[in-house]
């Protein structure tokens, strides 16, 4: 997980962002954003969520960008968007795609966004600049236009909010990948409050702490012992450790080398 905090004294706002992948059957990443008024005056602002979607695996990074986007099919819903490209292709041929990519968001009361910008073109404008999108800098609302075959964007605009001094507001973003169609309303119902996010966060911490203790070694070198705890939560490397049990000579040699390295 990752927790990040930023404060802008000139603007008068502080943001705290928690990102993690919760333990459970859902292939999702949660992002909880808490905005606090740290000034001595009322502050009004319009919150946006903006998650660019490539909607392909890393294997497709070097595919023809325009052709890739032409295969994109976007579905706009109450809480966000779902993207399901029609085909996957490379030099060996074409095959149907079954993977769905999605972004959904809500405030801490479970209310969805007022407006959704389903493509980068609609959100960024003609410049295509993700760092200065026209939707934000020129206060543009999304226009009804053809969205299929375009580069997708999980961008959403919430209603204007005014925070008194010391007050805060929270937004939850759910991002995911699935091999079947996902119900965004159900996901928001499951994760769409800070109390629920915090419960899943504590469960996630507990799970990984237990995983890190599955292999407990006291070598006399704290750096080496901590490194082994880290290795313990790496699925591929953990499989390697199980193989080493059948080859103790290799295990002892590696331990000796690493022990010497961490002295």
What are the functions of these language-model segments?
Residues 1-26, 128-156, 229-232:
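Extended, loop-rich substrate-binding clefts of extracytoplasmic carbohydrate-active enzymes
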Residues 4, 18-137, 187-214:
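Polysaccharide-binding surfaces and accessory modules of carbohydrate-active proteins
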Residues 8, 49-51, 175-177:
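Short beta-strand segments enriched in hydrophobic/aromatic residues
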Residues 11, 38-41, 163-168, 258-263:
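Short, solvent-exposed loop/edge-beta patches enriched in aromatic
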Residues 43-45, 161-179:
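Short Pro-Gly-centered flexible turn/kink motifs
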Residues 90, 149, 164, 194, ...:
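Hydrophobic alpha-helical scaffolding
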Residues 150-152, 167, 209-263:
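Substrate-binding groove/exosite segments of carbohydrate-active enzymes
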Residues 181-183:
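Short glycine/proline/serine/threonine-rich loop/turn segments at secondary-structure transition edges
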